[in-house]
Amino acid sequence: MRVDLITKEYPPFIYGGAGVHVNELAKVLRPLADVRVHAFGGPREPGTEGADPGVTGYANLPELAEANAALQTFGVDLEIAGNCAGADLVHSHTWYANLAGHLAGLLNDIPHVLSAHSLEPMRPWKAEQLGGGYALSSWAEGQAYSGAAAVIAVSGGMREDILRSYPQVDPERVKVVHNGIDLSGWRRPEGEAAAELSEATLKRLGIDPTRPTVVFVGRITR
């Protein structure tokens, strides 16, 4: 099975949670499927971070260099959609990539799944900042959610937000899949040097190593 992931962020260009999410998702899917990644940010140089097998990076189209940023995004989306032929499923992340996933699904008659990391209707302040660009991003996101075969929400709260923002979406198509943690990256340090570094780090942060520690990984919001 071939799965094409479509994303704005991918190494070395990660600046938020969505990029971390896609990077880790690609890692765990590769042993299970033929995974292709279509990412913004231009081609990755061989041997550098993000230049994994099956990764294609796309630069903004030079013809749209002076256009609104949302139109530049759509230009990349169109190019990505045209390169998803042969995929069995496309999976997009954030509004930047949602239109590419939506169009690729229509063009190739394959399911388009999207993961909700944020929602444009819940960011009305962007209208003042981006003007017409916000209208375009909202339109693209709405089209993608309306046509998606499935929508993944990272929590029950996000699922409620999706259904409130896009009431036209069938609730049966919105599934909750909580974010996970790769526990291999969370283990007791081994060796004298690692133990010394761990002790120094705890001391620097004011953490008492004799007391139990709970680690929270997530977003703190009101």
Spell out what each predicted region is.
Residues 163, 181-203:
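Acidic anion/phosphate-binding donor-loop and adjacent secondary structure
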Residues 111-113, 121-143, 160:
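Nucleotide-sugar donor phosphate/pyrophosphate-binding loop at the beta->alpha transition
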Residues 4, 196-199, 203, 208-222:
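Conserved donor-binding/catalytic core segment of Leloir-type glycosyltransferases
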Residues 92-97, 116:
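Short His-centered aromatic/hydrophobic patch
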Residues 1-49:
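N-terminal subdomain of nucleotide-sugar transferases
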Residues 157, 180:
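Carbohydrate-associated surface elements
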Residues 90-91, 147-156:
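A short beta-strand/loop micro-motif in the catalytic core of glycosyltransferases
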Residues 44, 49-84, 128-129:
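A short, charged, and often flexible helix/loop element on the N-terminal side
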